[in-house]
Amino acid sequence: MARASKREVSSDEAYSSEEEEQVNDQANVEEDDDELEAVARSAGSDEEDVAPDEAPVSDDEVVPVEDDAEEDEEDEEKAEISKREKARLKEMQKMKKQKIQQILDSQNASIDADMNNKGKGRIKYLLQQTELFAHFAKSDPSPSQKKGKGRGRHSSKLTEEEEDEECLKEEEGGIVGSGGTRLLTQPACIQGKLRDYQLAGLNWLIRLYENGINGILADEMGLGKTLQTISLLAYLHEYRGINGPHMVVAPKSTLGNWMNEIRRFCPVLRAVKFLGNPEERRHIREELLVAGKFDICVTSFEMAIKEKTTLRRFSWRYIIIDEAHRIKNENSLLSKTMRLFSTNYRLLITGTPLQNNLHELWALLNFLLPEVFSSAETFDEWFQISGENDQQEVVQQLHKVLRPFLLRRLKSDVEKGLPPKKETILKVGMSQMQKQYYKALLQKDLEVVNGGGERKRLLNIAMQLRKCCNHPYLFQGAEPGPPYTTGDHLVTNAGKMVLLDKLLPKLKDRDSRVLIFSQMTRLLDILEDYLMYRGYQYCRIDGNTGGDERDASIEAYNKPGSEKFVFLLSTRAGGLGINLATADVVILYDSDWNPQVDLQAQDRAHRIGQKKEVQVFRFCTENAIEAKVIERAYKKLALDALVIQQGRLAEQKTVNKDELLQMVRYGAEMVFSSKDSTITDEDIDRIIAKGEEATAELDAKMKKFTEDAIQFKMDDSADFYDFDDDNKDESKVDFKKIVSENWNDPPKRERKRNYSEVEYFKQTLRQGAPAKPKEPRIPRMPQLHDFQFFNIQRLTELYEKEVRYLMQAHQKTQMKDTIEVDEPEEVGDPLTAEEVEEKELLLEEGFSTWSRRDFNAFIRACEKYGRNDIKSIASEMEGKTEEEVERYAQVFQVRYKELNDYDRIIKNIERGEARISRKDEIMKAIGKKLDRYRNPWLELKIQYGQNKGKLYNEECDRFMICMVHKLGYGNWDELKAAFRTSPLFRFDWFVKSRTTQELARRCDTLIRLIEKENQEFDERERQARKEKKLSKSATPSKRPSGRQANESPSSLLKKRKQLSMDDYGKRRK
């Protein structure tokens, strides 16, 4: 049982009534929800009963008049009941919203009151820890300290009663502060068993809570910081009766792990994951993220910024920020957003050690205690170094400042039962292809490598060299194809792949499970092809993996009896918030510049729950840049420890130009000295043994480096990374001489003034060994995309035929020169002249100048304007003429099914064309309506029927329809601006305050009314024409009289003219 102080019991009694009220309100809301559902069902059944019977009644059936009257009365009665129920339902909905708002207001008021109370003893607690806080606390004097000055003993003007009251308060504070809660057992609502150091961490968090202090939980990765945090919230729930609300803000990749851990360890706490598309977030806001319905809100950094308006409605008990190093910059958008939320406590969680950077430390302290650490200038002045002797004192002061807020423990110190971790560096040579690319990269930027380039260019060379060390297929065009095939060439062309191919079968035989980390996502693609080729089952996570897919992969790998052997992870995306303790081998295919990132990757397996010894194999290409990258990472780890122990305030964060130059030059002599592969055929056990020896040598070297660094004095001009004697010897190597000796000059064109026939025949007829036949130049098939509409199938056939012929012809020549064969095998036929011409025509038919960007722009333009509006589509295309776009559109119309995802593309285009068609229909309907009026701005009338609203008047609707006809449907911003600038609505606040969405909804309502009116008008016109036609056919035609028949045509014509003139005169009058 937990031993709590009396103060804890009294606090429970103090808030019990308030908590009961909140629970009762919540129960009432839930009862109202059930009642609303029942009412909705009953109202729906009433409406079904009230609905008129649509079955036809026969003429023979006789319905009594009395029965009709009774049925009418029943219908009226049911309609009245339904109407009352609907009104009651509406009233209950209103009451429900009011109750929820009351709960939220009560909750926020309670949290705000606690916020005001917790600050009273905070400074006093901090001053008890160290006197340093007095310096910062003095900068913000309390009101009692701001009283006017006087002289003598009457200067304070403090009465005897006031002095007694202050003394009583101090005594009470001393009594209350003397006790403190210390749990001896974990909260009962926590499932599972807390380890001793985790229980100690929980007690540390409770002590911070009781003293009103925010803190940083910075235990090493894998020690269960998530569980300790959940245990704190469980303690508040069980012992303090505080159910929240709390908010956890974490990287998007860790949200699934947070939700799983809360459900697993403390299922009594109701957690809501606030993430998703706008529709999903709207549902969460309205149904789940409601006061009284949740305890913990788990969301990502991006959602906290995007939905800050929603989250600011709540006052939070605890805001917990995972991976808190993201807010070390106080000017970042995330840091500014997190400071906007109202909260009682803030808890930061980080697994990376805090560097002694003064400004970053101040940013964290300012976030934790803004009223104390309010000024960065004051902080910097207080810890300013005036000399070398003050260095140690300043570091001690920094540690004193951090002590009340920070808890950091290492696995080696607290987790004695955790199996050890063993790291081995496995070195491997380079293949012939790797050496070829490595040499070409150095020769390409010879000026930069000689020391004349900028740091940025050196970084680019270093990145390219590291790609070459990983696999040459990372360079475009290195892999043979298309068609691209999986085979032994994936392994033999890279030294690390040869090493991996030897290592994995050994690990498979001993029932180990493997995590493979790499920084390069494209390398994971190559590893994925390799695993499929060898038949190993695997999972994969990189930066493009979605949250649901990520959780499913982790679950599939960790489930009991899983057959997944390998897990491929990118170092950056897969190194955070993932528990893969079911694996016992970690392979670092390449090393990160920052060693902390590699440690995070290793801790995915070396964490609580691991039952086997964890083996870490770090691959390294010997005599290349990677050896220096790994050595620098080891030195940086040693320096990080030195920062904490010795207090180095100015640590080196980025590699400088000289270091980069040494790394790039390292091993160049070995690379240029030989073209052959340096991959050995040694057994994997022998390779591991040599790796252990190399790792032990490096550890001894780092130990000496640390001892030298401890004795080294602080000097701004010195470099921490200059403790390696090899670097000094290497700087003496003439790199330019090495490259020049192995440089292959390109052939030069020579022009000779005199031509000698004798010399020509001498050289021609000179006897000697026959020259070795050169390998044929294999034609390379250009990269063809589906949207370029080439005839890929036929082109592939022609290229394969040409390549096959050239290779067979070359092999035949080699066999003829080396082996005497009577009748060599027949060689396939080369391309005929017709096939060569066909190939050239096929290459011209496609759209080789169209890129993926052009294609996407074409699709978007088709969605916007429709496929037939070529002129508008061409206006959206950069660098394409209207003729080119028209030609592409014609081919697209016929061959769009050749695209990989043509169904999705066509659906998007058809959806856009439907919007255009609907827009045209709307504009025609409005035009038809306005054509019936001489001045529609004044005369336009809309037939509302019985559905006329009370918010918008007829003048507003008339103006809206006329402006839409003028501006076009969909231009809602322009419509809103027209309402605001029109003098008609100068004093109409309602109309001027409408949003574009509200105006669009009103306009759609009016358009439906106009379309209905147009249909009725067309129907009346059609009926009138039909009746006129029928009346004409029913009236007999009049025959001319005899006198008219006898008159001549000329006289009749004169009479008609006279009548028309008379009629015109009458009309003029």
Swiss-Prot record:
Annotated GO CC locations: nucleus
Gene3D superfamilies xref list: Homeodomain-like, iswi atpase, ISWI, HAND domain, P-loop containing nucleotide triphosphate hydrolases, Tandem AAA-ATPase domain
Gene Ontology terms describing biological process: positive regulation of cellular response to heat
Biased composition (Acidic residues): 15-37, 45-78
Region of interest (Disordered), residue spans: 1-93, 136-168, 1016-1069
Binding site for ATP: D219, E220, M221, G222, L223, G224, K225, T226
Compositional bias (Basic residues): 146-156
Molecular function via GO: ATP binding; DNA binding; hydrolase activity; nucleosome array spacer activity; nucleosome binding
Assigned keywords, A-Z: ATP-binding, Chromatin regulator, Coiled coil, Hydrolase, Nucleotide-binding, Nucleus, Repeat
Enzyme Commission number(s): 3.6.4.-
SANT domain segment(s): 845-897, 946-1007
Organs and tissues of expression: Highly expressed in growing tissues such as inflorescence and flower meristems, young leaves and floral organs. Expressed in roots, rosette and cauline leaves, stems, flowers, inflorescences and siliques.
PROSITE patterns, A to Z: HELICASE_ATP_BIND_1, HELICASE_CTER, SANT
Family: Belongs to the SNF2/RAD54 helicase family. ISWI subfamily.
The protein's name in its UniProt record: ISWI chromatin-remodeling complex ATPase CHR17
Gene (name only): CHR17
